[in-house]
Amino acid sequence: ELTFNGETYTVPKNPQRIAVLSNSVLSMLYAVDGKAVSRASTTDKLATELEALPALGQTANINMEQLLGLKPDVVLGLENQHKKYESQLQSNNIPAVLFNYDGIKDNVPMLTFLGELTNHQDKAKSVIATYESNIQKVKDAIKNQQPARIAVLRATGKGVTAETDEAVTASMVKELGMTNVVTSHLDG
């Protein structure tokens, strides 16, 4: 059993066939030297090793037949995207870890979890140390600057949205001490 943010998951001791339904989780898995048997479809540029993995469809619309055909030991996904597949995975006796990922504050716990899952705890600790060191370097580099007032906008083919501090990019901005005018406008 492994724990992530208070949730306990029953997973195989040494999983060899890890199916991943989200490329953000996939990137973290590979950061700790884990290996996967799948990825989500994307137009984003992926490392060659990740690009070579079978794509199971878009993150929110996974091809379950293809996933089950991979015979995974465990499936990693996101609760808000993949909960709908949980009962089908259970009926096929496939353990699933559906992370309730809540932005950058969950990066360290997720890296720790993935290190434990893959028995690469030392690699996870090393990645976390580098991650935290890099964040501190940026904070130190800007500590004497007047905090910027910014708005994080996301443009898609369907429109433009403004991010609150709950979104990943805007939460990074907040971590660096900048003021998100979208959030301050909502608060005021």
Which stretches of residues belong to each language-model region?
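Solvent-exposed loop/turn segments at secondary-structure junctions
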Residues: 24-27, 42-45, 81-83, 102-106, ...
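Charged, glycine-enriched surface loops/patches
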Residues: 86-121
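A short, structured surface patch at a secondary-structure boundary
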Residues: 20-70, 74, 79
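Bacterial Sec-exported substrate-binding components of ABC uptake systems
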Residues: 1-24, 122-153
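Short, structured coil segments at secondary-structure junctions
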Residues: 32-33, 92-93, 176
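Extracytoplasmic ligand-binding site segments that recognize negatively charged/polar headgroups
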Residues: 100-113, 147-172
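Stable alpha-helical elements in mature extracytoplasmic
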Residues: 25-28, 63, 81-85, 107-110, ...
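Alpha-helical, coiled-coil/dimerization segments enriched in small aliphatic residues
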Residues: 42-46, 161-188
